[in-house]
From Swiss-Prot:
GO terms assigned for molecular function: 4 iron, 4 sulfur cluster binding; iron ion binding
Name of the gene this protein is made from: nfuA
Organism: Acinetobacter baumannii (strain ATCC 17978 / DSM 105126 / CIP 53.77 / LMG 1025 / NCDC KC755 / 5377)
Coiled-coil regions listed in the entry: none
Keywords recorded for this protein, A-Z: 4Fe-4S, Iron, Iron-sulfur, Metal-binding
Record carries keyword Translocase: no
Protein name per its UniProtKB record: Fe/S biogenesis protein NfuA
Binding site for [4Fe-4S] cluster: 169, 172
Length: 212
C-alpha cells in the first residue's frame, strides 16, 4: 500500500488508517460490480470531535476525487481520505467479519469523537478535550460520562470547572472519590490554571442511573 496526497494543500498529519485484507477483498468485490474504471472509496468522518461522530465510506469515481484528499493505494483499488477527517481517523481500522448471514464491515476509529485543540484554544475547549480524551474512556467502563457545564471565575476559589456526570456515575455512592481522586486530578495536571472542580449533578437522585 502506498500513501500520497493529490494536492499540496493538505493536512499535515499522514493518515494512519488500516483496511484489513478481508475488508479489502470485500470492498474489491463491491467496487467491481460498479463497472466504473478507477473507482475507489472515500473515507470521512461526519460531526468529528463530537459524541455524534460517525465514520463514513462512499464510492468515489475518478472525477469525484477531492483535490485535497489523501490517496492510499491498495492492490485492487484506491482509498481517498478526507483531509479534515485525518486527525480523527488516526489508528482507525476497517475490517470485514464473515458470519453465517454473510458478513459485516466494521469501522473502529478510537479518535473520531475526540475534540482537537490548538495552542489558542479556550479553557473550555481544553477542558472538553481532556474529558473526551482522558476521562470519559475510563468512565465508560462503568457506563458513565462527564461533560463540562461552564467555567466560573470564583472570587473565593479561583477558576472553577463545573461538571455534569451522567449514566453510571449519576447516583454512584463513590462519586466524591471518583471526582476528587480521578477527574479533578487529571484536569489539573493538564490545565494548571484550573483551581477547582465541582459537580453539578445531584447524586441524591439515583433514578435513571446505572448504579443505585
Amino acid at each position: 500500500m502506498s500513501t500520497e496526497n493529490t494536492n499540496t494543500a493538505v493536512a499535515e498529519e499522514i493518515p494512519n488508517l488500516l483496511i484489513t485484507p478481508s475488508a479489502q477483498e470485500y470492498l474489491h468485490e463491491l467496487l467491481a460490480k460498479q463497472n466504473t474504471p478507477g473507482i475507489g472509496v472515500r473515507i470521512f468522518v461526519e460531526h468529528p470531535g463530537t459524541p455524534r461522530a460517525e465514520c463514513c465510506m462512499a464510492y468515489s469515481a475518478p472525477e469525484e476525487v477531492v483535490p485535497t484528499d489523501y490517496k492510499q493505494d491498495y492492490p485492487d483499488f484506491p482509498a481517498y481520505i478526507d483531509a479534515p477527517s485525518i486527525p480523527y481517523l488516526l489508528d482507525a481500522v476497517i475490517d470485514y467479519n464473515k458470519d453465517r448471514f454473510g458478513g459485516q464491515l466494521t469501522f473502529r476509529a478510537p479518535n473520531s469523537k475526540v475534540p482537537r485543540v490548538g495552542p489558542d484554544a479556550s479553557i473550555e475547549e481544553r477542558i472538553t478535550y481532556v474529558l473526551q480524551a482522558e476521562i470519559n474512556p475510563g468512565l465508560a467502563g462503568h457506563g458513565g460520562n462527564c461533560s463540562l457545564v461552564e467555567v466560573q471565575d470564583d472570587p473565593e476559589h479561583g477558576l472553577t470547572a463545573v461538571l455534569k456526570f451522567g449514566g453510571g456515575c449519576q447516583g454512584c455512592s463513590a462519586i466524591d472519590v471518583t471526582l476528587k481522586q480521578g477527574v479533578e486530578t487529571t484536569l489539573k495536571e493538564h490545565i494548571p490554571e484550573l483551581q477547582r472542580v465541582v459537580d453539578q449533578t445531584d447524586h441524591t437522585q439515583a433514578e435513571g442511573a446505572y448504579f443505585k
